[in-house]
């Protein structure tokens, strides 16, 4: 539910509820309730104030988490292509993984920068996109002080005057610094596998192996993807892609501290005019 003019000044209030993973073969059912409020032009014409609250229950393949988080901050639109945000937040969670049941409470200072120079954010054929986020956190209970960082970059290049062939690449890099894996919040660590990381592998199938079929999340993550899209008609395209991912036990990714896996596949894209619909088939290749 969305109200676009709550107080008469363009304020937006969004209430959301989501259920995920129904009938899935990995993990369980996830639930999430969200409340988000934003007020435009609060600190100048290009700077909005925002606040949000999220209540979630996650039942993932290797951990579960019941979490409440609140955040408030500012979002600045520097140009149509560049955005920045700064906030302060609080998170309380109860988690369960290989190390048992734990709870933590942290204060957070989330920072982000986003650059979008694509010709179309839903069906890009040229340009690039990058988003970097850094969230230092202060321990109140159950963990230690630290920070979580994540970078997502994408680039696109097309050939020919009619742009019938498009090359797309993506790189992701993440880390959790400060607490050890045993003391780190389980829902802040990294896994790889499934859509968004390495297609062809089960969701979150790669983490840090603890032996006896037990896996936890990693302190570092690398994701690399490449694909080629070829138009076969005005609306239809075929796609070939290759993904690889790494999860490590150390903040600085090193081969000896973790493992890689890869997947490849083919897909079909149909352009609806408001965005593409896509169907992929992938398999592990390493």
Where are these regions (language model features)?
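Gram-negative/organellar outer-membrane beta-barrel architecture
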Residues: 2-131, 198-200, 204-215, 219, ...
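Flexible, small/polar- and glycine-enriched "cap/hinge" segments at structural transition points
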Residues: 46, 77, 84, 243-245, ...
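C-terminal outer-membrane beta-barrel translocator/porin domains of Gram-negative envelope proteins
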Residues: 2, 92, 96-102, 106-235, ...
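Acidic/polar loop patches that form or flank catalytic/metal-binding clefts of enzymes
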Residues: 12-13, 164-169, 277-280
């Amino acid at each position: 539910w969305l109200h676009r003019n709550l107080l008469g000044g363009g304020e937006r209030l969004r209430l959301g509820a989501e259920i995920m993973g129904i009938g899935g073969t990995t993990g369980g059912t996830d639930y999430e309730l969200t409340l988000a409020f934003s007020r435009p032009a609060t600190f100048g014409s290009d700077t909005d104030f925002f606040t949000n609250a999220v209540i979630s229950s996650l039942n993932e393949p290797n951990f579960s988490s019941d979490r409440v988080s609140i955040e408030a901050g500012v979002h600045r639109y520097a140009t149509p292509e560049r955005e920045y945000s700064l906030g302060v937040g609080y998170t309380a969670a109860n988690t369960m993984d290989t190390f048992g049941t734990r709870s933590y409470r942290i204060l957070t200072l989330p920072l982000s920068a986003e650059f979008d120079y694509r010709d179309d954010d839903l069906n890009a054929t040229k340009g690039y996109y990058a988003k970097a986020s850094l969230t230092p956190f202060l321990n109140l209970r159950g963990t230690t002080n630290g920070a979580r960082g994540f970078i997502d970059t994408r680039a696109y290049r097309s050939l020919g005057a009619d742009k019938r062939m498009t090359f797309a690449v993506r790189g992701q890099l993440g880390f959790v610094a400060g607490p050890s894996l045993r003391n780190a919040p389980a829902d802040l660590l990294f896994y790889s596998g499934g859509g968004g990381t390495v297609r062809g592998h089960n969701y979150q199938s790669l983490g840090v192996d603890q032996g006896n079929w037990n896996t936890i999340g990693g302190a570092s993550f690398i994701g690399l993807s490449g694909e080629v899209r070829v138009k076969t008609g005005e609306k239809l395209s075929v796609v070939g892609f290759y993904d690889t991912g790494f999860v490590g036990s150390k903040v600085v990714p090193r081969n000896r501290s973790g493992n890689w896996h890869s997947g490849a596949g083919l897909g079909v894209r149909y352009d609806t005019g408001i965005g593409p619909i896509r169907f992929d088939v992938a398999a592990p290749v390493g």
